[in-house]
Amino acid sequence: MNKKSVLKKSLELFELEKIDRDIFSWNGKNVGYKRIFGGQVMAQTLIAAYKTIDVEHFAHSYHSYFLRPGDMDKSITFTVDRIRDGKSFTTRSVKAIQELSLIHI
């Protein structure tokens, strides 16, 4: 496998499908591991939050909790709560749900 295809496969782990205005989905990809790496879920929640922001704001602060382990073979739904849209800051709360269980907030 060449470097380009490895990079492309890696980036596919972060592609979220828009389901509704504030709901996104990741369909799960078997890459040889049973459990999802926590950094992947963190990145996906940040991507979901960014997809709900119209103006150019950058992440200033990020707080999260891992509640349950995630499974690589199963889809994850990301729900975004729009807490505040201001001139300087935008606040979002994102929940990652897998099989009706909250795995990350």
Regions found by a protein language model. Name each.
Residues 1-103:
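Terminal targeting signals and extreme-terminal segments of soluble enzymes
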